[in-house]
């Protein structure tokens, strides 16, 4: 076995010092690039694991909430009482009428709600201010309580984000993270959870979502579309029946 020599080679003796420094710098640069790439890969893997873990936790949370509602309803029936659900926190609003013959106040509210076109839809947090707005625009919209399936399918099938005032499809979690990462909303599932549960950053999440552009409902609107829902029309409050309508408009 030949022992390794520490004696410099002829090439290294006669190589200019600047070339030696350049070679050393290039080697260090390559090592740094490799290390940075490995670090990025590790960070991406950790993020994927975090997103998957959160999604599992959300699913367990949704199932637990559903079981609780079923149990409360069952208990109320057993005691001979009528089960009254909590007042909804989340409402989905759809514009069903065009621009003709809409009074200025109602038109202004439509603009505030970002319902600029017929068949536009938005999520809103239900509170006193929204309730008063909906009363004014009730002849021109329909609204109700979306379930988890509706929220999820709207965002996955018709969801677009507002990025630099542009309408961008939610084709990658990176788009959501770039806009909402500072609120710990990193993925589509995080966004769905924030909207559906009306979380602490609901306002930012809802404003990030571009108003949904829905199709006219499969089978068409009711014959007396502009009458109130309870009178056989489509306008106004329809509670859980909003879910069936949305399915026809996706």
UniProtKB/Swiss-Prot annotation:
Domain of life: Eukaryota
Chief place where the protein resides: cytoplasm
A molecular-function term among this protein's GO annotations: structural constituent of ribosome
InterPro entries: Ribo_uL30_ferredoxin-like_sf (IPR036919), Ribosomal_uL30 (IPR039699), Ribosomal_uL30_CS (IPR018038), Ribosomal_uL30_euk (IPR005998), Ribosomal_uL30_euk_arc (IPR035808), Ribosomal_uL30_ferredoxin-like (IPR016082), Ribosomal_uL30_N_euk (IPR012988)
Biological process (GO), any one: cytoplasmic translation
Keyword Ribosomal protein set for record: yes
Entry annotated with the keyword Cytoplasm: yes
Gene3D superfamilies (alphabetical): Ribosomal protein L30, ferredoxin-like fold domain
Compartment(s) where it occurs, according to its Swiss-Prot or TrEMBL record: Cytoplasm; Nucleus, Nucleolus
Pfam families, sorted: Ribosomal_L30, Ribosomal_L30_N
Keywords: Cytoplasm, Nucleus, Ribonucleoprotein, Ribosomal protein
One cellular component (GO) term of this entry: cytoplasm
PANTHER family: 60S RIBOSOMAL PROTEIN L7, LARGE RIBOSOMAL SUBUNIT PROTEIN UL30
Family of the protein in this entry: Belongs to the universal ribosomal protein uL30 family.
NCBIfam families xref list: uL30_euk
Role of this protein: Component of the ribosome, a large ribonucleoprotein complex responsible for the synthesis of proteins in the cell. The small ribosomal subunit (SSU) binds messenger RNAs (mRNAs) and translates the encoded message by selecting cognate aminoacyl-transfer RNA (tRNA) molecules. The large subunit (LSU) contains the ribosomal catalytic site termed the peptidyl transferase center (PTC), which catalyzes the formation of peptide bonds, thereby polymerizing the amino acids delivered by tRNAs into a polypeptide chain.
Subunit structure: Component of the large ribosomal subunit (LSU). Mature yeast ribosomes consist of a small (40S) and a large (60S) subunit. The 40S small subunit contains 1 molecule of ribosomal RNA (18S rRNA) and at least 33 different proteins. The large 60S subunit contains 3 rRNA molecules (25S, 5.8S and 5S rRNA) and at least 46 different proteins.
Comment field (misc): There are 3 genes for uL30 in S.pombe.
Name assigned to this protein: Large ribosomal subunit protein uL30B
Organism: Schizosaccharomyces pombe (strain 972 / ATCC 24843)
Taxonomic lineage from the root: Eukaryota, Fungi, Dikarya, Ascomycota, Taphrinomycotina
Name of the gene encoding the protein in the UniProt record: rpl702
């Amino acid at each position: 076995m030949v022992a390794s020599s520490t004696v410099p080679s002829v090439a290294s003796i006669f190589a200019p010092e600047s070339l030696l420094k350049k070679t050393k710098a290039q080697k260090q640069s390559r090592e740094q690039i490799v290390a940075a790439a490995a670090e990025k890969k590790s960070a991406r893997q950790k993020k994927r694991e975090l997103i998957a873990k959160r999604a599992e936790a959300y699913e367990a949370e949704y199932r637990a909430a559903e079981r609780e509602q079923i149990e409360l309803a069952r208990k109320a029936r057993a005691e001979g009482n009528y089960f009254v659900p909590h007042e909804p926190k989340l409402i989905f609003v759809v514009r069903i009428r065009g621009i003709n013959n809409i009074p200025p106040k109602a038109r202004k509210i439509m603009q505030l709600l970002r319902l600029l076109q017929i068949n536009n839809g938005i999520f809103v947090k239900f509170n006193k201010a929204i309730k008063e707005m909906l009363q004014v625009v009730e002849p021109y919209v329909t609204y109700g309580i979306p379930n988890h399936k509706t929220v999820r399918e709207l965002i996955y099938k018709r969801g677009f984000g507002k990025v630099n005032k542009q309408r961008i499809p939610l084709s990658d979690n990176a788009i959501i993270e770039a806009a909402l990462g500072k609120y710990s909303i990193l993925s589509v599932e995080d966004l769905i959870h924030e909207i559906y549960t009306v979380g602490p950053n609901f306002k930012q999440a809802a404003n990030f979502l571009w108003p949904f552009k829905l199709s006219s409902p499969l089978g068409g609107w009711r014959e007396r579309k502009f009458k109130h829902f309870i009178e056989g029309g489509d306008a106004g409050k329809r509670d859980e029946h909003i879910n069936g309508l949305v399915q026809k408009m996706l």
